[in-house]
């Protein structure tokens, strides 16, 4: 199985999304799709994502915005990843 999640995004916008909308921002493999990203987040963080939005940045990286369920706090996952 290929590595789907490459690294978390550590920008101010990513932290603001964690605090306000319970969304974590990740850089993922360019070839991965939304269902693979959901499975990777579910297995890595033991939480079920509600929604995944993706985009390809001008630097040719794929960025995924993963909205977590309300029973999971994105700030806890951010602290675990070292974003906060």
Label for each model-derived stretch:
Residues 1-84:
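Contiguous, often N-terminal, cationic amphipathic patches that form binding interfaces
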């Amino acid at each position: 199985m290929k590595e789907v999640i490459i690294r978390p995004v550590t920008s101010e916008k990513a932290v603001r999304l964690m605090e306000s909308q319970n969304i974590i921002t990740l850089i993922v493999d360019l070839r991965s799709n939304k269902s693979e990203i959901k499975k990777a987040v579910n297995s890595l963080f033991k939480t079920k994502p509600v929604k995944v939005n993706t985009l390809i940045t001008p630097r040719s990286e794929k960025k995924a915005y993963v909205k977590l369920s309300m029973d999971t706090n994105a700030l806890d996952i951010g602290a675990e990843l070292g974003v906060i």
